[in-house]
Structure formats: structure tokens, C-alpha cells
Amino acid sequence: MTAPLVKVLHRMQELFSNIVAALEAMIVFPSLFRDPSRKRRKTFHGAYWRRRTLDNFAEEVDRLFTSPLSLRNMIIMSEKIREQFKSCLQSSPVCMLPSYNHALPSGTEKGTYLALDVGGSTFRVALIELGGAGAMKILQESSSPIDNDVKLLEGTLFFDWMAEKIESMLSAVGADYGREAVPLSMGLSWSFPIEQTSISSGLVIHMGKGFLCSNGTLGQELGDLIVQSCRRRSLNVRVDAIVNDSSAALLSRAYVDPKTRMSLILGTGTNVAVHFPVREIGLTKFGTRPPGWFDYAKHVIINSELSMFGGGILPMTRWDDILNQTHLRPDYQPLEYMVTGRYLGEIVRLIITEAVETANLFRGELPHSMRDPYSFDTSIVAFLEADTSPSLVPSAALLQKEHTFPVSPSVEDLRFLRRICQIVSKRAAGYLATAIHSMWCLRNDAEFSDPTESKASSVKDTQEITIVESEEDSRSLSIACDGSVINKYPGFRDRCQGYLNQLTQQTNSSQGPLDPATSPYIRLELAPESAILGAAVAVAVAVEDQKSG
């Protein structure tokens, strides 16, 4: 069978699966597809509603979402996810990817650096001063929205726009700042895929998210494109480090907390970076490295792409199934679909839709605007969960501002919604903690195992990697946290920390008697401004590395 025919058949199979999923959704949630002008047949629905109350429905949701969160279940899930990590460490081209950042900051680095943070909607430029002893200061900064007009800039025009913003920010510092004979060191936090070729270089590939700047620049060196645009404005800058957001978070927190070995991004999406022994990683994962890189790189920061793990391990409910089956990329990011800001609101919306059909929520009338997928934002979920007022008046006001209700939601409706939001976010915190615990165990296994007994496929005839960690290390660590959900969702970080405490206690107790005061731990620590600060720290570390090399 020819390759094109196989592709056609595969696409037809995907199309058929999506049609089946849509039909299932029509059967389960007919209100999503009902003509709003059609008169409701109250007799039928009246009998249907009497099958269960809102309280009974909430109990079912609670059972389905929280029953996997027993300590025993979470330990088992953690062990299974660890096996997925181990497999991907050896050969996967899409996850557990080693970066070029092998050294962590000591906290003593000093200097003033230009830092850039290019995200999906904002471009930030800042001048950062590192003062040593973990002291970081933003001397000057600017933030520019990346609107649709900017996204449509093709080729070098986008980098020219960046250079204009860089020049504007530096001019606010001093007329000649950035124009001296000695190049100004610059770090870049780049939130898009690149084919990285060194700590300071990478080749442009398709960016997605509506950006067109890769048109005409594919395969060109990213740092050179930025530098050339800056030179056209007589700016003398040099790109010394390129990092992604999770690596930037780890580096920024490690500068002030020497126990930082992991980072967590949890906002619209999620990811984890971890400082990991080189010897435990498959050699093919490294691609082409500079000469001698393996001689001095004992560790490397891994981009785990955590969102892709947990498939077939983390239990799903019928609402998760509908979300997954109707997604453009079903099964692609199992963990992400159940824990992130992009999807928590949609899970709640799907539960609401069924509650309207079967438990008389909102008197059986689903607001028309809630019929659209992803129309129930996670910010509403967070607000509802945080509302402790007796009659939930603030929640009612927000709901009626965002959606049009034929009849105002009752207090019973609002209490049901708050409970559902609490249940959905509780599971998200538990599943995330399970994945983090799994990564912690994986790191401990690799870090404290006998390197002579390593079974990793890193050691090849063509390249021998026998790096042995000589520095004293600890199983206790801090995780740098950034992102709207982990930083701002009420109680989420505390709940996740509580699960981590239980999981680490269980792991510690299984290894024999330990002094509670010295037992290994995981601490979730906020890393504010991590993308921009981490870019500066990455430069400082790279500069120190060049000096020592």
C-alpha cells in the first residue's frame, strides 16, 4: 500500500472517529444542539429531571473525579508515569529533550544584561542587573502587545519590529546605551519551537500561533536575525543565550535558591524542566553538540513536555472523554487536557451541560452562549471557587455578566457550580502532583544510582559518556513555579503542595526510618517574572561558563 494511500485512509479514520464523537455528544448533551426557538416538551423533561437532584449529581461527579486520588492510587500512577519518562529518555524525538543549558547559577554572578521575552501575545524587553548573593533587579523594561498585525509581519520585518522596541527601551536608559564598542550581552526567552544548535543559537522553524515571521527565514539562525535587525539601528548587541520558558523559570529561581532543580509552568498549558544527569539520557537525544561538550557537562536541563504524559494511566471521566474525542488532537496531551487553564473551564462546562439536561440546573435552560465549546473560561471557575459569600451574589453577578440567563441562577445552582469547580480543580492538583512526584522519583533514581550500573543507552562505541557527579546533592529540592493557574488560581498551589507532601512522605517511609526534620521534600516556590529574569541569568551563566572553559 503506497504512503499517500495510507495517509488518506488514516485521515478518513480520524474523520470517522470525530463524527462518532460528535454523534455521542449529541446523544448525551442534546441541549448543545437544540434549536432555542423550539418549545420545550416539559412533560418528558419533567420526568427525566426527577431521576436525580443536583446534590445527587454532584455526589456522582465528586466520586468520579476524586476516587483516583487515594494515596495508594497516586503512588501507583506515579510509578507508571515514571516508566513512560524512562522510555522517552532514551529515544523520543518529542519529549524529555535535553537543552544546551548544563550549568546552574551559583547566585554569585554579577552583571547587567539585556533580556528579551517573546511570548504568544507579548514582547518584553528589560535591562536586568544581577548583583550577586541572589540579588536581581529590573532596571528598565517595556512591554509591547503582539497583536494580529505584528503576527502577520513576514520574515525579517518581525525582527525589525523587535529591534525597534529594543532601541526604544535602551534609549530610556541612555542615548548611547547599547551603542558602545563592547557588545551588550543579551538573553532570549523564546516561546516557540526552534532547532537549537548551541546555548546561543538555533534555527528558525515554523512558529504556528498565527505568526508569519518564519516565512523567508526558515533554517536561518535566530540570534543572527535579531542582531542584524539591531545593527540596522546601530545597536551593538550579542545573543549569548536562548532558553524556553520552563528553562528560564528554573534558572531564575536557582539564582536565589540553590536547591532549585525543577521548574513548573502551569497556565494555559503546562510543562516541567528538570536538571538531570547526562549519563542517564540516550545519546541520540543530544543531536550534534560542540566538541568536548560531554567532557564538562555533568547535567543538562531537560524539557520534559510533561503535558504529553499520563495517557492510559490517569483515569478519565465521561466528560474528559468528550473533550478528548472532539479535540483537534485527541490523546496528544493527556495531562494538559485535565489540569491546565485552557481546559478546566471546558470540563466544567461539559458537566454543566449534562446537569441542565438531567438535574434541572438553571431550570433546564442552558444559556445559549454556553453551548459554544470553551465558552466557560477558567477565570470564572477560579472566581466561583473563591466565593465564600453566603448567597454567592458576586458569582451570580459575574455569571450574568459573561452569559445571558433566561432566569437568574438560584442559590442552589450557584452552590452546585462552586462544588463542581472545587472538584475539578482538586483532581487537577492531584494529577499534577502525581506527575511531579514521578519526575522527582525519576531524578532521584538517576542522581543517586551507581553510575557504573546505569543501563541507559548513553554509552556508545562512538562516544563514551561516563560523567560522575562529584558534588554533594540532596533529594530535597525546590520547584520554580510560574503561570496563571499555579500562581493565581485560589488555593491551587497549596492543594498541590499538600498532595506532594503526602506522596513524598509515603516514598520516604518506604525507604526505612527517617528523621522527619531531615526527610527529603519538594517545595513549590513562586518564580515571578521568570521568563525575563531567567533569560538574564542564562546569559550570566553562559558568560561564566565561557570564562572557565
Curated annotation (Swiss-Prot):
It comes from the Eukaryota. GO terms for biological process: glucose 6-phosphate metabolic process; glucose metabolic process; glycolytic process; intracellular glucose homeostasis; mannose metabolic process. GO terms for cellular component: cytosol; mitochondrion. Residues 244-529 are annotated as: Hexokinase large subdomain. Residues 159-185 are annotated as: Glucose-binding. ATP binds at residue 110. The keyword Transferase applies. Keywords: ATP-binding, Glycolysis, Kinase, Nucleotide-binding, Repeat, Transferase. InterPro entries: ATPase_NBD, Hexokinase, Hexokinase_C, Hexokinase_N. One of its GO terms (molecular function) is mannokinase activity. It is an enzyme of class 2 (transferase). Monomer. PANTHER family: HEXOKINASE, PHOSPHOTRANSFERASE. Catalyzes the phosphorylation of hexose, such as D-glucose and D-fructose, to hexose 6-phosphate (D-glucose 6-phosphate and D-fructose 6-phosphate, respectively). Mediates the initial step of glycolysis by catalyzing phosphorylation of D-glucose to D-glucose 6-phosphate. This is Hexokinase-1.
